[in-house]
Amino acid sequence: MESEKSNKMKVVLLSSIAEDLGWNEKFLTIEASQMKVFSVWKLINSKLHQDNIIVSINQEITDMDAKINPNDEVAFMPIFTGG
């Protein structure tokens, strides 16, 4: 029986991050102790460095130390560059 309060979240990868990791959207369930952006990043990725990443929770830019709540959408995208 699934608990009433699930630690499920939607993870979205954009642009080159999606290309590098081979997917662009997943639903994950993680332990309450791992409900920070950095923990999710380490869970889904082992080869890309976090310094070149922008992260958002529910479409608001945040940082790797931000807390994630159940049912949040977490998106990882590369730093924007332009000329």
Task: Tell me the role of every PLM-derived stretch.
Residues 1-82:
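Ubiquitin-like/PB1-type beta-grasp interaction modules and other compact soluble beta-rich domains
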